[in-house]
Amino acid sequence: MAKVIGIDLGTTNSCVAVMDGKDAKVIENAEGARTTPSMVAFSDDGERLVGQPAKRQAVTNPTNTLFAVKRLIGRRYEDPTVEKDKHLVPFTIVKGDNGDAWVEANGKGYSPAQISAMILQKMKETAESYLGEKVEKAVITVPAYFNDAQRQATKDAGRIAGLEVLRIINEPTAAALAYGLDKKEGKTIAVYDLGGGTFDISILEIGDGVFEVKSTNGDTFLGGEDFDMRLVEYLVGEFKRDNGIDLKNDKLALQRLKEAAEKAKIELSSSQQTEINLPFITADASGPKHLTLKLTRAKLESLVDDLVQRTIAPCKAALKDAGVTAAEIDEVVLVGGMSRMPKVQEVVKQLFGKEPHKGVNPDEVVALGAAIQAGVLQGDVKDVLLLDVTPLSLGIETLGGVFTRLIERNTTIPTKKSQTFSTAEDNQQAVTIRVSQGEREMAADNKLLGQFDLVGLPPSPRGMPQIEVTFDIDANGIVQVSAKDKGTGKEQQIRIQASGGLSDADIEKMVKDAEAHATEDKKRREAVEARNQAESLIHSSEKSLKDYGDKVSEADRTAISDAIAALKTASEASEPDADDIKAKTQTLMEVSMKLGQAIYEAQQAEGGAAGDASAESGDNVVDADYEEIKDDDRKKSA
């Protein structure tokens, strides 16, 4: 049987591994290295270079050497992160035909999936050279906070590279697999993964072959690239102060500075001081200029201290979501090249109150975990159960713009959840299902993943139709949503496509905004719930007044009409006040009591008590929002 390989497709470096008997083994590339730079370059004559050869010529060919492209994968061109990256990289980021962020080399545009595919091809060739056979299947890792668009784009990259991607697995989870495969006793561990482009923290319970993720969190704007750029900015500032020359717009100089910054950062993990020496960095009328500077570990730590501190909040959030304290964590596993930095290790020790575990290679452990998962799928690794989670809540927009969650964040996947909704208007023949992801109370504040229509509902009173909405998330974290009218059996479904995915900026913004706006969100939700209750009361009161108004006095009819009008005004305000709506709702209920009594007496007179009224079929169903979709609009959104 052909081998299934495990690939860690990293922002800065990539790594490939395979099961060799009962153990996972990292495969060395053609250059003899165990990791490969995630870089692709195009020479003037069109030659394509991948990995170390691309890195070697980056200084002389900065505009056509592409790196850290993983930051762009699955992102729209207008994404705030893309805007930030445009000013940090020497190559050009352009808008693709589909509106995604693409990169340009030698005047030709490439999608990030294409560039990633070139790196995956290098990994595939490395494995084929070692195994002596063709490789067609792989397990590929992604950051835990990657969204649907990014996961789908990663699968596309695998397909372009000639690989069938059997599974997309989260990087911290893969690391936990490699760490805990031979651990029999139960443990609660934290995987602290600070890599080249992203930061993830996952809390897991492991033991006797079971790996259960309890929670995950992260910061998708944080990684080694940010540390490098902080040092580059410092070097640019120092050089400008000493020489009066700004190197910001000199792409050749910036590429040299970036390489020097990365080298100095690595050296300072094992020494207290290093020297950055870049001769002929630029020139002016007086002649060539050289950059020579001594950099201490203390200075580097002061430059990047806020970046390191930014890892603390996600860690605390993950602990809270998992329902454990730092003291209850048995082991903290460090993953990612940046976790070698002494300052990072010091912060981790302070946060968790224990020395972090350094028994795994932070550059290789993720690929090893991917290989183990490949072995599980292939049947070579027995008695291993992996339970991962979805990082953000998923739900739909319901009446009043409320975000109704169907699947809460940190729910174990794969998972399937259904809930029954109904219509908001009489004789409503179509509903629009808007699928959103996030942590805010109002749908508009979360990210719209996609929408679709369920049409052909038979005319009936509001609240009567039973519409079952089902969310289905597979083991790759890819979402599918369906809606079915229980009465007619009509059904529609949507698979969230890459163009509708979330950006990293959106995900981080959702969680942080949710915390910052918790009070505001609560007030707005209360107002919407009060308005929904008010509209229901108005509807029933108007109907009762029309049918039985002649049973009460003119004064009572006027009082009820005035109370209905006042409640309508309060509930239709542009900034509805929950307390005002509740007060006017109470007033309407009180003035309607005589009408209710008259209705009861009329029914008694007609034939006695009707007995226990049958429960209204719309009870316990959440009202779904309604929007008429014209054919032209439907075509545009398709």
From Swiss-Prot:
PROSITE patterns: HSP70_1, HSP70_2, HSP70_3
Compositional bias (Basic and acidic residues): 514-529
Gene name for this UniProt entry: dnaK
Protein name, per record: Chaperone protein DnaK
Cited CDD domains: ASKHA_NBD_HSP70_HSPA9
Presence of the UniProt keyword Transferase in the record: no
Function: Acts as a chaperone.
Record field: compositional bias (Low complexity): 605-619
Modified residues (Phosphothreonine): 198
Protein family membership: Belongs to the heat shock protein 70 family.
Pfam families, per database record: HSP70
InterPro entries per the UniProt record, alphabetical: ATPase_NBD (IPR043129), Chaperone_DnaK (IPR012725), Heat_shock_70_CS (IPR018181), HSP70_C_sf (IPR029048), HSP70_peptide-bd_sf (IPR029047), Hsp_70_fam (IPR013126)
UniProt xrefs under NCBIfam families: PRK00290.1 (NF001413), PRK05183.1 (NF003520), prok_dnaK (TIGR02350)
